[in-house]
Amino acid sequence: MSKSKKVWVADDDESIRFVLEKGLVDAGFEVSVFEDGNEVVNQLDIDKPNVLLTDLKMPGRDGMDLLDTFKNEFSNIPVIMMTAHSDLDTTVDAFENGAWDYIAKPFDLNDAISKITKALEERKLRSKKRNKEDEILSLIHISEPTRLWTI
């Protein structure tokens, strides 16, 4: 199994966790499921996902709290929000707070898989870009007294 296809699912609804876990595993993803945001945060000390799919409204630490944690500490990990509360204000709030995408419940499993796949592809491209930028910067030498740069 590719380590770059690690998806974490956080939802307080057991049936949603079951459907997503089964569907995503069948689609070739490595999946971990969590009942709430506290479980996700506790697991971050041990491992990290390549993408987080989280319910917006959960008891305890909810999806917006997780989004804030990921935005501040793991900004390279895409967060996809899920909710049955698909009003425009909620959607705008999620995007303004750094959500990569948004899935309204009830959802189509193929749509969820497509959004996760796109998030993983974009993450991979951003990582490649960052590596190339670092490589280019390592080739540049800046002379401190003159501030001239050479390659």
Say what each PLM segment does:
Residues 11, 55, 83:
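Active-site residues of response regulator receiver
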Residues 39-42, 64-75:
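Short amphipathic alpha-helix used as the core "switch/output" element in two-component signaling
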Residues 140-151:
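Single conserved hydrophobic/aromatic residue that forms the stacking wall/gate
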